[in-house]
Amino acid sequence: MRIKNPVKRKIIQIAAFGFSNLHLLNFNGGKIYRGSWKQFCNPGLNCYSCPAASLACPVGALQAVSGSMNFKFSFYAVGLLLAFGVALGRAVCGWLCPFGLMQELVHRIPSPKLKLKKGFVYIKYVILVVFVFVLPVAATNYMGMGKPAFCQYICPAGTLEGGIPLLAAHEELRQTIGPLFFLKLAILLATIAGCVLIYRFFCRVACPLGAIYGLMNKISVCRLRVDGQKCVSCGKCRKVCKMEVDPVKNPDSAECIRCGACAAACPADAIHIGFDIE
């Protein structure tokens, strides 16, 4: 399998976004879908509380692992994410993540474009450990339920997709607005600004799902392979990579989202991305 056509990727991204948000009519009245499909996790980042959302939030499910005694759901959620990680790695980010598509569209806004300082990519691992695992455990109450710290204090997807639409639809919710909402609104605005300037800013800096899937890039079935005999060392693959990865030197980089831009740019047909089952 070779991935070279960026139009195909965009079609799949749009289809994944649409399937993740089937209940558009729920925006009218600010309802949240709570049907049987909410038992399943979206592989990408999409807020549970978004009125249109048809699947559960995987980050919320992970926080349930940390702060809940409901191990049946917890182990199911972990197993599902591990399955996606082993099968696809960060190809989930590049092909199936609704919030990832949003970031790419925002980046199209005309502006100066910046590169990301290398050290910033490690922030997402700190967020994963502290806000998805440590804080939910530390805040577990006497009923064995912890607070979803990432969702409550950081997640810009939740603010954009869930918080703002629900506040717009419900007067009683607007009366409860306090400092926490303004903090999350500031994080959302900073995220949007970052995504305008830097390609997939949130995905690369702060997304805990990106951290998890990135760690699994080296073992995932979806691989990037470089044929050393065909490679002419022209450097075009490195220049076109918006995630700032050098595919020749580091094909299993935790930052590679398997988008296929490098394969499309390679004049020697030396780069292949697909499922490596041997």
Regions found by a protein language model. Give the residues of each.
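Non-ligating segments of multi-cofactor redox enzymes
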Residues: 1-248, 254-278
